[in-house]
Amino acid sequence: MLMGVVSMLGDIVYESGRGIAPDYLYFLGTSAFLVGLTSGIGELVGYGMRLVSGPLADRSHMYWLFIFLGYGLIIAIPMMGLTNSIWLVMILVIAERLGKALRSPSRDAVVSVVSKGMGSGKAFGLHEFIDQIGAVVGPAFLGLMMIWTANNFSLSLQSLFPFYLLMMGVLYLTYRRIKGTVEEIRRQTTATNEKLSRGFWMYSGAVLMNTVGLMPIALILYNGAKILESGGQLWLVPFLYVIVQLVDAPMALVSGYIYDKIGIKFLGVPFALSILPIVFSSLVGLPGVILACIAYGLVLGMQESIYRAAVTDIVPLGRRGSAYGFFNLMLGAGTFVSGVVFGYMLDVLVSPTLMLDFVIVAQVIAIVLLLGARPKKEKE
């Protein structure tokens, strides 16, 4: 619960940034390809660097150091309000994702230990649900600031500094509260050189292909900005992101409970739903963008809860930090390819039919790989 509150406060800041960054970059004159590239590189760094931070956390047992460094880098989001340079904004977007890479494996390992006996699906689902409260409040607050400041991106982004300071304060209090519990359990668990199972690699490959075929939210919002600009309604873009988070939050909680009953085969549902964002994005006008946001929110809610929960069920605790690192590298690589490919296809006006064919092929491969994954519950 405490880590969920910290994540909630973090989400108020960084999800606000993720909701407005495509809008801001479009306002500064950036192409769809560069927005997709920035999103892709950010996710590749954000997920790929976990391959380093995860094993380092396992071997050094310095979980809290990585957590503090990672949350500290969220300061990149309000700092975006201090510049109107396209390239500097792109760098700050990527820097925030680096922070995500540093904190996430250690945070997930801490959550998996503290929630022992609760059920991995429920634990990660509950954490994500609390998390998403901030993910809704943040973009909504930023949207209201955009209205109040008459679409002033700089002042709106700088208004996030107080939330950042509050988050760091609560993180310190959380550390003081649960450090002893985590350390006591950690001393009973040592890192191991046991190889990760074939089922884990099949599962990671399935997630890779799933993300390759999922249209990035940054480009869905970019399309929204293009539609809304003519009416001077760029302030609406953060509220489109609020729609994503409003769907994401309950879906994370519900899917966590279903996953605990059905198991990994339930992941076939978000894989199939991943086709919908591109279908709806091909529709003309704002309604298509709204439907694409809803569809993306359904997938995201499951991606951020049960995708991680499946790793917990496949991998023993001593290798879990490393496993999250490898798993997230696959997730990041898939998101990078997705951002570049979809951004390019939007810029050169590839036909919606061809884009849909690409998505369907990717999701079929993902489902086939998923069928080869056989999670094995570990007794801890």
Q: Whereabouts are the PLM-identified features?
A:
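C-terminal transmembrane helical hairpin of 12-TM major facilitator-type secondary transporters
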Residues: G263-Y307
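Cytoplasmic helix-loop-helix junction between adjacent transmembrane helices
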Residues: L92-I133
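Juxtamembrane intracellular "pre-TM" segments in multi-pass secondary transporters
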Residues: R177-A206
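Symmetry-related core transmembrane helices of the 12-TM Major Facilitator Superfamily/SLC fold
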Residues: L155-Y172, M355-G372
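Structural signature of the two symmetry-related core transmembrane helices
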Residues: L65-M79, F161, K265-F280
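Helix-loop boundary and gating motifs at the non-cytosolic
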Residues: M1-E43, F200-S230, V237-L240
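Helix-to-loop junctions at the C-terminal end of transmembrane segments
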Residues: M49-H61, M146, M251-G263, L346-D347
